[in-house]
Amino acid sequence: MCIRLLLGYRQLGKAGFLQAALKNLDFLWTGWDDELGGGIYWYKDRSSKNACSNAPAAIAFLLAYQCTGNEEYLEKGKLIYDWMNGALRENDLFADNIVVETGAKNHWKGIYNQATMIYAGSLLYEITGDETYYDLTRRTVNATLELMFREEQTADGAAEIRMNGNPIFKAWCVGWLARSYVKFYETDPAKDTKPMDMLKGVLDRELLTRTEDGLYDPFFCSGQSDPDNVSELLAQDGVASAFLCAAYYNVFLR
């Protein structure tokens, strides 16, 4: 919610959006403590600290800094980002969570967690110009290419890019992957086109999955299926977000 409010404030200038976001950030920070060296809890039972509660929080605090210039938000964004890299980074990807009582980790590498850390790292590089953030982010981008995509040959010998199903979880996670790749490209001095080229290859195939009802495959032709998920609004939002990011990239960035 904070991220959407802050992006809405930047686009529309509505003070109410900013006020609501900052109030929510105050509450969000109550989930941070020094157990396991820091990090924000996933839930009020304080049993685990998850990538999906920390990486988006880092984004929100960094956006709040960009909207207000308040250094406190920048410092909190850095703290969260640094904690993620210290506690959950594994071979340039991010584990799902760590249990507070035992320190045990869930090593699943969901794409949402990778995408939000790419976005957070891109913001930090954009704000600070510190090459450390760029290097960490670039390495995660490259790791997601191996995690998410595979190249196959069609019957006529043509190359075809496909997505691996397990890291997807939900289509809205791929929407976040598209946002993060666009944000990385915007800040990347090398202007590496490979991440978006790979994603666009998947989206070209995704266009062909449109049903008579106007719905798309929420697993992006990866081979996974969930009939109950096809008509879910959140699933189709993820597809639409990925299409919009690709269109923005093609029209405004290339």
Positions of the model-derived regions?
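Eukaryotic tandem repeat interaction scaffolds
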Residues: 104-153
